[in-house]
Regions:
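Flexible, active-site-proximal loop/turn residues at the rims of small-molecule/cofactor binding pockets
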Residues: 78, 88, 211, 249, ...
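Active-site flanking residues adjacent to catalytic metal/cofactor-binding acidic residues
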Residues: 46, 75, 182, 207-209, ...
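Cap/insert and terminal regions of metallo-dependent hydrolase folds
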Residues: 177, 187-276
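Short, glycine/acidic-enriched loop or turn micro-motifs at the edges of active sites
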Residues: 50, 79, 185-186, 211, ...
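Glycine/Thr-rich phosphate-binding loops of Rossmann-like dinucleotide-binding domains
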Residues: 54, 215, 253, 281, ...
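Binuclear metal-dependent hydrolase catalytic cores
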Residues: 1-179, 189-190, 195-196, 257-287
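Structured alpha-helical
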Residues: 271, 287-390
């Protein structure tokens, strides 16, 4: 019997506002949007930030006109979690059907999410109003503590600590449990307990990690966000299996996120930093949690043939040393064929021998960062995409 599989895709991972700074391209600049495909085929979308547009462009049918039925959870109404709504092509295809879930805001009253839709598409802020969205839409208000089922999947919603309110969601599927807890500041005992209940035993715990512990203790206190340290401590306390650091600050460069991830991995083994294009698969009861990043190369690479020695860490946490040939390289990175499967978002030490003009070989010592892992062309090998960091 085939084990149930769920697939979680990250389309937007940045917090507060989108960024196009070249120093942030590796993790991505779009604001929050995730997609979860449950084993029974149910499609969930978590938040509608600017990453939603990218999801729409990858929709299965042209223009999104495929008769899809999708469930969308909106955690709260701040700009970075709703900005993608007017640009999501499947909303404009009449054969599609969407179920929306969010809370009643004390500032808006009844039908809060519908009001948010209408307001941000009202003239003169957008060329067309909400009537142009021909897809079928249903809105459901969710309260703190609500539990409900969608086909084979159980959903629980709890309040988190964020200005004007925010919901965290726990989605239990036959393949495992995903907890989405973005935009939360620790420190309120009741709301901290809500988060513990949501995250308990989760296979994937996606947690707000916008600030460093030093920032939260000083200049960012009261802004409604958390840190990698709080996520690690909570994941360990409640027995979450894999932690995903999420909602990266727009001022955090890739190297800053790298540093946050290294700090987190020193204290908790199974940690990833959310990155656009990252896909996490969950096997039966969460026994098989794997993260990978298929996708297009950032720059054009040239064919080459350099001998290389590679040192890194496998997915199981063991150090490996391997000799190989680098056949595909650019100024920014390389595609390396490896028998050992390195951990995604881990560091590789690459020593290459390159020919000089005088016929002699010189040695280059480079530090690389694993950004993607695909099936290799050689049996038993993986094609590992590496970005050079120095």
């Amino acid at each position: 019997m085939t084990a149930p599989i769920a697939k979680l895709s990250f389309w937007g991972v940045r917090g507060s506002t989108p960024t196009v700074d070249p120093a942030t391209w590796r993790y991505g600049g779009n604001t929050p949007c995730l997609e979860l495909i449950a084993p029974d085929g149910t499609q969930f979308i978590l938040d509608c930030g600017t990453g939603l547009r990218r999801l729409g462009s990858q929709w299965g049918a042209p223009n999104g006109n495929g008769g899809a039925e999708t469930h969308i959870f909106v955690t709260h109404y701040h700009w970075d979690h709703i900005q993608g709504i007017p640009f999501f092509a499947p909303f404009f295809a009449e054969n599609n059907k969407f179920h929306f879930y969010s809370f009643r805001s004390k500032f808006l009253g009844r039908d809060s999410l519908k009001q948010v839709f209408e307001a941000q598409m009202a003239l003169p802020y957008f060329p067309v109003d909400m009537s142009a969205m021909t897809a079928k839409r249903k809105f459901k208000e969710v309260e703190d503590g609500d539990t409900f089922t969608i086909k084979e999947n159980k959903i629980t919603a709890r309040w988190l600590n964020h200005p004007q309110g925010c919901l965290g969601f726990r989605i239990e599927t036959p393949a495992g449990t995903v907890v989405y807890a973005t935009d939360n500041e620790p420190g309120d005992p009741k709301l901290d307990e809500n988060l513990r209940e949501l995250a308990a035993g989760a296979d994937i715990f996606i947690n707000d990690a916008q600030y460093t512990p030093e920032q939260l203790a000083t200049t960012r206190k009261g802004w409604g966000h958390s840190t990698w340290k709080h996520g690690v401590d909570l994941a360990r306390e409640v027995g979450a299996k894999t932690l995903v650091l999420f909602h990266h600050d727009p001022d955090s460069t890739d190297r800053m996120v790298d540093s946050i991830l290294r700090n987190a991995r020193e204290e908790f083994d199974s940690v990833f930093a959310a990155s656009e294009g990252m896909v996490i698969t969950l096997g039966s009861a969460g026994d098989n949690v794997q993260a990978h990043m298929p996708g297009a190369r950032a720059t054009l690479r040239r064919e080459a043939q350099f001998r290389a020695k590679v040192t890194g860490v496998t997915e199981g946490g063991k150090e490996f040393h391997e000799e190989t040939i680098v056949r595909d390289i650019s100024l920014q990175g390389a595609l390396i064929s490896l028998q050992n499967m390195p951990r995604l978002q881990s560091e590789l030490q690459v020593t290459m021998e390159t020919p000089g003009e005088d016929g002699l070989h010189s040695t280059m010592h480079l530090r690389g960062y694993v950004v993607r892992i695909d099936a290799g062309t050689e049996k038993g090998h993986s094609a590992v995409g590496v970005v050079f960091t120095d």
